[in-house]
Amino acid sequence: MGCESSLDPRVARLIDANLDRAREGLRVVEDWCRFGLERDDLVISLKDWRQRLGKLHQERYKRARSTVTDPGAGMEHPAQLDRHSPRQVVEANCGRVQEALRVLEEYGRNVDAPLSAEAAAIRYGLYDLEVTCLTATSGNNRRNRLQDCQLCLITSPCPDLVDRVKTALRSGVAMVQHRCKSGSDLERLAEARTLAALCRDHGALLIINDRIDLALAVDADGVHLGQDDLPTDVARGLIGPGRLLGRSTHSLNQVAEAHREDCDYLGLGPVNNTAVKPERPAIGAALVGEALAITHKPVFAIGGISQANLDALMAVGCRRVAVIGAIMGSDNPEKASQNLLSSLSRPTL
């Protein structure tokens, strides 16, 4: 009774307000983890934290509530209106909850020790969960963008590589796979950084071929691996869940295996004979059609693909291709990019 009567009503009001703030913010993040990420593990933690705070939301705090006399009620900051993506909403609400929990921890220390201790424990737990949630959100965003990609430009060494990529991006290409096979690591890093900046400026995905270290160094959207590169589980452990992982395939068995693994997309080919991989026999367009029937993951046909032979792939339902020479070797990379994109976006008859 002494604690009840000695509680400063102003402290009771701010504890009530911050309990509301923390629980509401946790619910905002929880719903994104539930509906946006479909991460049961995160939802369970967030729901548990909400309920633990709810049990500590005593009647004496609620009785002190006075929204009418609260000078901060209804106040907005311009930053609150500048949230245009789920990631920004999650970041803002995690920050909101962390601040509220710190207030509860500090003001509750002398009037409600259990609340203070619980607020501290949840705050530290949220620091880690926020990182996990934002990483998963980045991966979710990248995977959504991947679904919209129809044309992937694979680079090949040439004096005007950056200019050609820039032209392709301006023409609507939304995915670039950088093959960094020549030069020193310092030169490769510099080139990858330039391409990463270009892709960010144009809202395009940048995938680094083979080199996980370079992909991480330039904060690329993902990495593409061949059949003889690191196993998928090892690669995923290195790049984390927030980046894309592609795998080259050359047969239906390899497609089926990649489908079962934690890959985000597949490259399948060579569809036609190609100077890049002359030792590999062409698999033909028909096999691409068969592959599309056994996986829901995006499949990019690759290998000697050009405007001249694109119809054969489209006839079997293929709407995603990866090209090298068709753009990198074209006299007019802008027109080549636009023509390929126009053909790939034609409605199915």
Curated annotation (Swiss-Prot):
Listed cofactors: Mg(2+)
Molecular function per GO: magnesium ion binding; thiamine-phosphate diphosphorylase activity
Entry's cofactor comment: Binds 1 Mg(2+) ion per subunit.
Recorded metabolic or biological pathway in which this protein acts: Cofactor biosynthesis; thiamine diphosphate biosynthesis; thiamine phosphate from 4-amino-2-methyl-5-diphosphomethylpyrimidine and 4-methyl-5-(2-phosphoethyl)-thiazole: step 1/1
Record-listed Mg(2+) binding positions: 210, 229
Entries under InterPro entries matching the protein: Aldolase_TIM, ThiamineP_synth_sf, ThiamineP_synth_TenI, ThiD2, TMP_synthase, TMP_synthase_cyanobac_bac
Record region (Thiamine-phosphate synthase): 126-349
Binding site for 4-amino-2-methyl-5-(diphosphooxymethyl)pyrimidine: 177-181, 209, 248, 277
Name of one Pfam family that matches: ThiD2
SUPFAM superfamilies: Thiamin phosphate synthase
Keyword Transferase set for record: yes
Keyword field: Magnesium, Metal-binding, Thiamine biosynthesis, Transferase
Annotated stretches, region: Unknown: 1-125
GO biological process, one term: thiamine biosynthetic process
Chain positions recorded as 2-[(2R,5Z)-2-carboxy-4-methylthiazol-5(2H)-ylidene]ethyl phosphate binding sites: 304
Region (Disordered) residue spans: 63-85
Gene Ontology CC terms, in alphabetical order: cytoplasm
Highest taxon of the lineage: Bacteria
Function: Condenses 4-methyl-5-(beta-hydroxyethyl)thiazole monophosphate (THZ-P) and 2-methyl-4-amino-5-hydroxymethyl pyrimidine pyrophosphate (HMP-PP) to form thiamine monophosphate (TMP).
Record protein name field: Thiamine-phosphate synthase
Native source species: Parasynechococcus marenigrum (strain WH8102)
Taxonomic classification: Bacteria, Bacillati, Cyanobacteriota, Cyanophyceae, Synechococcales
